[in-house]
């Protein structure tokens, strides 16, 4: 049996310590969501190489355990459909979060390598833009099929580098794959409009690609976020430079390999690596026309402000503090299960994690039962069968999360379930924080005002629906929210009055499917939410409208004097 730690404190109903089960199912270093950098020079392993045995199917060659890699290889750049060893002098060590064993080194790509990526994308753009939409669509069909064939392999990369359970990592891949599948239908949505505006005259509008675009991706969704960007950008005719997180670039490296196999021409998709210098290069490089970013407010606001000042389009999804209002009339069993899953899945490292519960009226008495359900979750290495959640991304993240839990104690909150100090016996060196529930939280406390980005649920008590709505609206973030109720009128009022971009009614994580768009608001998205990911807004972000008015006279002009008045075409 693995080592166990009790997670209950201070609540009479939970005073007897009950163990959790120990078996379980930069700007990117410097400015990723609630993280700190780890920039030690290191020996490494190129994820793409490690997962791609030369003589075997790529879909069946991948790690299935947290066993230490004996000869780690360096992660390369990806330029012109080739993996290219970096000449970097600075490297980022990447460790398995469950063991802190070295997995690979990720380069701070050199200035020459950064420029080479944009050179490749710029060179590829004219031919890719001229490629017919049907040809691009056929490539995307092949890409989707290859992602499905390599689904397990991609998930294994995520588990090894990011720490998610295999099942959760498969979900990461699937939500990105759904966007790629939706992108196959982009030709239908790219159709323009035409109108005969006068005799022999027509006006037509249509969408054109921007050129070279870039994506700066976070650590928490190594497959999904790149797949929010690459399929939509390329299907609309752009070429792209991707900077995956230096914490877990392996999934994107595999996706790049599959893109080349699917038939994407050289230079259409390129990968560079690094932290702040790479981000600054992307922001300041004039040939890059648009930037997609998901990550922390500190990074995103900087990228949005500086990128916009440089004349670029910027879509930036930022931090969150997602609330769920629990009404007394709700289906209690469904609500408690949904809350536990949404709060603690992926160790709380989701921008749509349900991190805050608003307990309305008598529902505050349900918290001991919620804590019991959280104790039943299995915390272990992601490759272990039955794991429900794994480690957090780094020792620095663990330290920060535990510091916020401690601050809640100091400010007078009640630690109903305490996940600090939990260590599975098989993985004593991992970055472990167990599910934590903090009760009696007040709006001024740090655990409420800051995004924790860990397996921590903070709970506030209110008396009425009005109080719940006012509390949620007073929070500066607006990524998502949820309500659990059986009352249609209550849900309708909540839907109308709450200021959040994505809302779930009896749904804890209301992330829209690709036919819609990811529509956070308030401080959770830069620029007031004008540029959102995927769906029609995603297509609009990666394209510009061209309007053409043409005149083809059916008879020769007979007038010899030019007219200087404003034409009205009437």
Task: State the predicted function of each range.
Residues 298-442, 466, 471, 505, ...:
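ALDH superfamily catalytic-core signature
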Residues 4, 45, 101-104, 288, ...:
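Conserved C-terminal structural/oligomerization subdomain of aldehyde/semialdehyde dehydrogenase
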Residues 100, 136, 158, 180, ...:
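Residue-level signal for inorganic ion chemistry
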Residues 38-41, 45-98:
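Hydrophobic face of amphipathic alpha-helices that form TPR/SEL1-like repeat modules
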Residues 1-59:
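N-terminal mitochondrial targeting presequence
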Residues 191-334, 462:
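Rossmann-like NAD(P) dinucleotide-binding subdomain of oxidoreductase/dehydrogenase enzymes
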Residues 101-190, 200:
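Glycine-rich loop-to-alpha-helix module at the N-terminal edge of alpha/beta enzyme cores
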Residues 103-109, 124-130, 215, 324-327, ...:
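Short, well-ordered beta-strand elements within core beta-sheets of diverse protein domains
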